[in-house]
Amino acid sequence: MSDYKHTLNLPKTGFPMRGNLAKREPERLAGWYQTDLYGRLRRERAGKPRFVLHDGPPYANGDIHIGHAVNKILKDIIIKARSMDGYDVPYVPGWDCHGLPIELMVEKKRGKAGAKVSPRAFRDACREFAASQVDGQREDFKRLGVLGDWDNPYLTMDYRTEADILRALGRIIQRGHVTRGFKPVHWCADCGSALAEAEVEYEEKTSPAIDVRFAVLEPEELDRRAGLGGEAAAAGRVAIPIWTTTPWTLPANQAVALHPELEYVVVAFDDELLVLAAELVESAMARYEVDDYRVVGRCDGAVLEGLRLAHPFLEREVPVILGGHVTTDGGTGAVHTAPGHGQDDYVVGQQYDLPTDNPVDGNGVFLPDTPFFAGQHVFKANPKVVDLLAERGALLHHEPYRHSYPHCWRHKTPILFRATPQWFISLDKAGMREHAMAAIKGVSWHPEWGQARIESMVNGRPDWCISRQRNWGVPIALFVDKRSGEPHPESERLIEAVARRVEEAGVDAWFELDPAELLGADAERYEKVTDILDVWFDSGVTHATVLERRDELQVPADLYLEGSDQHRGWFQSSLLTSVGVRETAPYKGVLTHGFTVDEKGHKMSKSRGNVVAPQKVMDTLGADILRLWVASSDYSAEMAVSDGILKRTADAYRRMRNTARFLLANLNGFEPAEHAVAPPDMLPLDRWAVDRAYLLQQQVREAYERYEFHRIYQMVHNFCVVDLGGFYLDVIKDRQYTTKPDSLARRSCQTALWHVAEGLVRWLAPIISFTAEEIWEHLPGERSDSVLLETWYEGLFPLDDSDPFGRAFWDDVLAVRAGVNRELEQLRNDKVIGASLQAEVQLFCPPELKAKLDRLGDELRFVLITSEARVEDLERAPVESVEVPGENGQGFRLFAAASQHPKCTRCWHHRPDVGHHADHPELCGRCVSNVDGEGETRHYA
């Protein structure tokens, strides 16, 4: 037997089968930074339209987790895709560097500021710690393949940024949005500080739920108002009961609130009268285990306004007041009101000029002058409050109650609502809420439900407490009058003076400032504010401190992209401060992604053992697998990740890599400038392949523009596996391997492969950037050193509508091929044939389909990958033929059988002319021509 292997054009490439990503990616990464790829890309796009994605700063504490990886990869995909669109896309990463978590880490090592270490040294240690965390996170983000200005990130602790945060505060003060007040705020006793809304998490908690009698001091007045005819005056006891799950707040009670428009009834039982909301009588009396009662009077809540009640255990009268916040969701329809311990209570208390009493210290302990409970922690005092109520005869009912309660995000402990002197951004004083609601409507929200979510949050939120009683942060650099508490009338000028000093020396410039340096003789009248700003203010004003400041950026940014929890966090703090500065949103578009969960939908946690660390994935599978998983996930919902899911992603990656390798291997010996065939001269099947890529590129680009990356993954994967792997690449192997090296048949095919590869490498580049770079290096022809410097490939072209071998033609051929393959599979299962080339097929077709298939002539067999394929009229179909159904009358009948002809050892086709040539007795006539003659001519496939 002769060996004809040397006569075949076998595939050959240096592109390895295995990605070995964990080893190769760091090497490629080093190359990117040695050649300043990001800088070159910026220079390449200079002067082009700009697209600005503003990076929401992660917190500079701890290793990056899978959520960080998702966020940064999504941003990087968008930036690289927009760059492919031809935009100038600067990416300036940032970090949030102030705040409590860093303070707590430093406290563990150095002790508390002002105790074991000076405040200055403490802040220095915080700065040093934050810088070390930034360095660690930066390397991991770079390792993910995220391209950006990593040498010049923005840090909220940079001196200039700290100064600009102050300037932004000054602008917001100037517009009248900042107020000072003694108001209830979320307070963590463990932190010793107020908390922002975004720092509050809701967890299940069991609390004592109690119904408490507030005795009516003037029963005759109740008789008169409710028309009771003396029932109240005659009763032994008359009360309005409240229901609460926070007994510890009762010492601060100042009133009982009713809804003005609700109907209330007076219920009589035994020798007692109770006033209850009509809708809640049944549930309340069931709670009190009273079956035998009667309704003796009715009135609206408004009628009872001003009725005097007795505090259940303090020597204090409290009034009945009216509030729209009272509901009938539960309880009694009467709400215990402590303005020092709740936002609704505070608001209604202001209307009635009630005292805002707060008997609780910052550590959660009752103040020394608190009757009955002095020195006790509020939560530990709950049982004692209940006992005292029972002792005084004020307790109607008591039971444990499981409910959702706010907890500190850091300590995971229940928080307090506690009135303290704080600085606030007022939502309504100067129209901020109104302007914010208007600005929201001008933003493009992805997904669309994001708009309704942030609208409801902004519409319902209280004023924003921006002050914190901590050490590590940007100071609220105000001087306030010692007597009135009012800010200095020249605060705007003074803030700028402080900002200039902070720009030189950091926040210590304020903390160590002698007021006389700026105020002169006025220093005696004023004192420095020692509070610092909420870190959400720091990150919220990056539209002013970063976007406005850096020449390559702009405000509004085109896109903010973060997790869906940021509707109540960064998206909102950015919106409010931007409205406070310039009355517009800081972003044109907002994109949110869901959280990561495991395969079963469970939240990631160390205790469950289901945490997927991005560092481990990169060190084993490679960053491109992580990037492909992100792209393949529908990030608008929760994103499931596990070792099993990543393994399946790696399998999909291998299929795409193998497709790329096949393309590259079959471009061996092809130089586009020399060998590329003009579109009109290409074989119809090759033009079809380019057309498929052309159509796909349109869809891919549209999906990138709509941020639908999972669709890109599905489409490109499907193209590789079905269009290419399942059809085109299978069909062209014969032509590619067996025809003459420089024949039109082969060069046409290589031209198609080249066009497809040029498109594919760019579609993949934003997603699996490392692999795309590797493909790029192995493509033939002159090219830049990085695919990331490129724009979308413009060499793809569509099929002409008038082409007899147009899209409709190939759709029908593919349908025929699918029907033939099903029958061949049956023959294979029946052990009649092995490979499809062992088969011969006869197709009996209706006239229209026959006319189409006849266009391919003898080359139909190459499309079907059978040794023979004949097309005949449907009427001639033998009874043993099989019906193959089709759409629109395109069904046909098929007869398939094993070929009886000998096999050509070179092309493996079974042909009647094998052995007809004395010099090549093992070859078919076609192969003889390709080896020794002029070579075969292909017209179609």
UniProtKB/Swiss-Prot annotation:
PROSITE patterns (alphabetical): AA_TRNA_LIGASE_I
Motif 'HIGH' region positions after renumbering to this chain: 58-68
Residues that bind L-isoleucyl-5'-AMP: 562
Top-level taxon of the source organism: Bacteria
Motif window: 'KMSKS' region: 603-607
Gene3D superfamilies (alphabetical): 1.10.730.20, HUPs, Ile-tRNA synthetase CP2 domain-like, Valyl/Leucyl/Isoleucyl-tRNA synthetase, editing domain
Enzyme class at the top of the EC tree: ligase
Pfam families per record: Anticodon_1 (PF08264), tRNA-synt_1 (PF00133), zf-FPG_IleRS (PF06827)
GO aspect biological process, one term: isoleucyl-tRNA aminoacylation
Keywords on record: Aminoacyl-tRNA synthetase, ATP-binding, Cytoplasm, Ligase, Metal-binding, Nucleotide-binding, Protein biosynthesis, Zinc
PANTHER family: ISOLEUCINE--TRNA LIGASE, MITOCHONDRIAL, SOLEUCYL-TRNA SYNTHETASE
Family affiliation: Belongs to the class-I aminoacyl-tRNA synthetase family. IleS type 1 subfamily.
Protein name in UniProt: Isoleucine--tRNA ligase
Species name: Alkalilimnicola ehrlichii (strain ATCC BAA-1101 / DSM 17681 / MLHE-1)
